Amino acid sequence: MKKILITAPLRQDIYVFQAYQDALDRLEIPEGFEASRFFVVNGCDEVIPYIRDAEFVRVENEEEYSKTHNDHIWTMDLMWKMGDLRNRTIAEALNGGYDYWLSVDTDLILDPWTIYNLVQADKDIVSEIFWTQAPNGRYWCNAWMADQSAGMTEEWRKPGLYRVGMTGALMMVKRRVFEAGVSYDRIPNINTALRGEDRHFCVRAACAGFELWVDTHSPARHLYTRQLFEEYKAGR
């Protein structure tokens, strides 16, 4: 039996988190696989009573985090803190003997066939795509070819499996990638040129010889604002 750890740092609105868990409950698990959940609760103790069917640890949060009605507000310190929290989830996967680590940010609503499609892809590192509309109306996704966010393509709106340069937020990684030393540790000689822990992870993975891919058969839904959550609950 192959083991999958579904995991994420957790700092989220209760209602969004409940919708997130509902989507996890609907996931189709392939035959021969089993899935468990693990969260690192990051300064939002109010959500703890609502966690179900999951293990969790609680960490103190000394960094102020906020978001507007349009976007998250990220500082460099918050990004590196997020990297530390993601490393905590990797350690849980390694220590728990898991074969796959599936990181799913807690504002994402997964399609029921997400795990099935990611397992079928059979890649060391593969994400499932989701698209987000920025305040300026432009759409961006959680995969790109190079640098900060260059090389997104409309081709990825077609169902398929595509090689990419970088990805994150909704990503399945095989155990051997972590055993090779790939992590979310900050690369000390790359600073503002590549902002964000996902980018540093992808650079480390590429340097270790691993390819990165994105699957587009079952896009997730990104509820990163209250308005988007209300639209989702209204069935739009």
Report residues per predicted region:
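Short, high-confidence coil segments that cap the C-terminus of an alpha-helix
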Residues: 98-99, 123, 210
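Active-site beta-to-alpha loop of glycosyltransferases that engages the nucleotide-sugar donor
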Residues: 3, 8-22, 43
